[in-house]
Amino acid sequence: MIADGLKYGYNSITFDSSLGFRVDWHGAGNLGTASFPITEFSWKACSKDHSISAPSNLQVFAICIKKKIAVGTVTVAITKTDSNQTPHPEAVALVKPGFALVGGGAEVHWNEWGNFLWKLEPSTSQAQSFSAASKDVIYPDPSIITAYALGIRIDE
């Protein structure tokens, strides 16, 4: 499942289940500001231009699993953590105990010029977590970032 969007320099797409995005821009540029779960069954991705109007396409990619599978029922847990407001915010969301990390995302709560995602990364350590970071570029725009961890477990 792929959804495409175009909206005068600021893109926002919401649809059921997803785990990735790509901003296809030309000219001045358009960068990602969000890719995160809204509910256990829906995802949102956003991008924006930076000081110069730069319309672009935003593609959001879906990877899905059925709720009922042969070995049981898939239960989803979404956890989130907010950063402090800063020019280069970072946050780490921990997976709920008893769940396996399957993905994550982030939403930047930017103010005027924008603060853009540069890091969406699952943990490589024993602590199951998902890290996110963003930064302002050229023009100061201290922002808050919310990191999300998406976990699942199979219940019989």
Cite the ranges covered by each PLM segment.
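Extracellular attachment/recognition segments
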Residues: 1-156
